[in-house]
Amino acid sequence: LNAELDGDKAIIEKFLYDSKVDRNKTTMESLLKNGQQRYGIVTSDGTIVDGNRRAMLLNRLFYKREELGYSYEEVEKCKYFLAIILPDDAEEKDIQQLETIYQMGEDDKLDYNPIEKYLKCKELKRLGFSEEDIAGFMSEKPSQIKEWINVLDLMEDYLKEYDYEGIYTRLEKTEGPFVDLENYLDSYKKKKSNVRNADWAYSDSDISDLKLVCFDYIRARYEGKEFRDIAKTGKDGSIFFYKDLWEAFLHQHEVNTPVDAKTVEELRLEYPNEDLSILLKKRDNEWIDSAKGQLKGNLQRFSRKLEDKRASNK
């Protein structure tokens, strides 16, 4: 999308507004009452470094005032976005550093989508910043930055698995299971002490199978105890700890879990004018509807068998 084109700008502003409707309504009330209280930051060519959401809300209040029921006098203070302009010689690396410090290193970083911190780490690494540098910008520990980068790698594997590469909106409300899964997979790969009770010598291929099975359950929006029963580490273990349970569970999963009726490319060709995010959400929902009975039934059966294993080991 090109923010300089009116059509693309409208799409971007709609996305920003819809992503945090309640929060945006509260901010709009504040802007109406008090005006803009904090300056934004803008590059010399007009790119907003800090303040995209506020700029969008100011535009919305001023240019949609009649639709929203406000008079010119009520929204006059919203006519302009007040900002500090960066010098002409500011480089991309400098801009990204400044943007991160302002957006992710302050208390209001909670305003941002959880996935954004992962993408910001990736971008800063691309620009050559170390994990220690990024940690300083974000007021985090280097170990946290390393974990976020690893979790994003896992998220991107997930997107590739379903032909959603680069479409990060499909990760909405999945952060928790991905964080858990990354920790589980890391423990299995490194054979840490928290997997010593596993009763078989699993291979890298088995770990890969585990990852793909968990991807299907994440896609179906499983989390909490049900999700943890598949791969959890620690003294209580999980289905993956027991060779007989895992192989039977995996077989049932592979045989009975349906595949998508259409590829992403087929959907794009069939509905060329439809919003891609809507198409993909519909695709996921249709798959969930067809798969949820099998996923739920298989997991419940083997969770009961897992409880029996745990009881017999006590």
Q: Whereabouts are the PLM-identified features?
A:
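Charged/polar low-complexity intrinsically disordered segments, enriched in acidic residues
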Residues: D244-N313
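Short, charged/polar connector segments at secondary-structure boundaries
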Residues: L1-E73
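N-terminal leader or domain-start segments enriched in small/polar residues
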Residues: L1-R23, F137-S143, E147-D186
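Amphipathic, charge-rich alpha-helical segments that serve as recognition/docking helices
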Residues: F15-L16, E73-K160
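A short, Lys/Arg-enriched interface patch at domain edges and termini
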Residues: F178-A201
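Short active-site loop/helix that positions an aromatic residue
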Residues: R53-Y70, Y202-S208, L212-E223
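Eukaryote-biased activation of long, low-complexity terminal tails and linkers
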Residues: Y217-W246
